[in-house]
């Protein structure tokens, strides 16, 4: 059974959190944080968060502080962030993007805009993770094939030229050590 994507909504307004949950519907599981500190604590405890909907202007630890913590811990690599804020200050919007947000939705917003952007961001991150897995698998497979080829060639060299196949394997090990420095 596939689990629903888990969305963390960090907003100091209970009404805004309820509105976002109502707009997004039953297709997601929700976590709620009333401030930045609670959002950070939830991200420390949970590894199953698929998306963060973040308000920038909150008392105490604000959205910018949350983004700095996420950047420091490299959580932005795993958790996309959509800022939903009433601020129209271009400097704040630019600052949010510089800190690593994926998207920015300005309040008041259209229902369809929130739905589409959330769906698109989740889909893009899922594709990115799948591609990363594929590339990683290919790199491991290529390295395995390379090691296998060197082993075969060392046996061929030993058999054909009466040279030590062990010598070829030692050269491979030394080369590998030098390349990793």
Language model features by range: what are they?
Residues 32-51:
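Acidic, metal-coordinating helix/loop segments flanking the phosphotransfer/catalytic sites
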Residues 58:
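Receiver (REC) domain active-site loop signature in two-component systems and cognate sites
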Residues 91, 109-118:
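C-terminal output helix
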Residues 124, 130-181:
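Acidic/His-rich, divalent-metal-binding segments that scaffold phosphate/diphosphate chemistry
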């Amino acid at each position: 059974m596939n689990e629903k994507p888990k969305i963390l909504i960090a907003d100091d307004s209970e009404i805004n959190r309820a509105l976002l949950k109502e707009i997004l519907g039953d297709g997601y599981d929700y976590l709620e944080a009333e401030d930045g500190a609670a959002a950070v604590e939830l991200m420390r405890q949970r590894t199953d968060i698929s998306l963060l909907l973040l308000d920038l202007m909150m008392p105490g630890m604000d959205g910018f502080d949350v983004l700095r913590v996420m950047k420091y811990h490299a959580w932005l690599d795993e958790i996309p962030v959509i800022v939903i804020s009433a601020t129209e200050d271009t400097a704040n919007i630019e600052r949010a993007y510089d800190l690593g947000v994926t998207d920015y939705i300005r309040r008041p917003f259209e229902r369809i805009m929130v739905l589409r952007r959330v769906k698109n961001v989740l889909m893009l991150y899922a594709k990115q993770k799948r591609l990363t897995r594929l590339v990683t698998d290919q790199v491991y497979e290529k390295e395995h094939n390379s090691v296998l080829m060197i082993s075969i060639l060392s046996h061929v060299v030993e058999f054909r030229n009466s040279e030590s196949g062990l010598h070829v394997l030692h050269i491979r090990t030394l080369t590998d050590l030098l390349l990793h420095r």
